[in-house]
Amino acid sequence: MSEIIIRKARREDCEAIRMFIQELADYEKMPDGPKIDYKTLERDGFDGQPLYLCNVATSDEKVIGYTLSYYTYSTWCGKSMYLEDIYVTPDFRRKHVGKKLLKAVAKEAIENDCHKLDFVVLKWNPAQEFYKMYRASDLTSKEQWHCYRFVEEDLKKLASDCE
């Protein structure tokens, strides 16, 4: 097997990353979920102040996986990081690529004074076992936190009532 290299994503990786976002959405049984294109990823990640951090895993210079994360802030502990996505193509799963990608995110978080790394995993997703191997806590069962969301339409309605 070729050497697996983890590196910062480049603008030219955005087409592959967008394709992987769709593959991840398909796996998560939400094929209509992703609404962005690779141009949005390019703009938001590489123009002006980047809105996200992204690493890619490569084999023979071909992108085979990625992570996408960003900084958050916790009133309990300060600077934090959120892991939005981690994805490895099926041919490279169970070859420690996910571990290398996750470790790169953890290193970035620690080097930038983050006190925690948050993420969500679907209830049925076997990836939970992967995260538990590295001592991730399931906050839903441990602390009874539930995740909520306002979708764009509801967010607009809520904002329209703002004085």
Please give the residue ranges for each predicted region:
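Conserved acyl-CoA
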Residues: 100-116
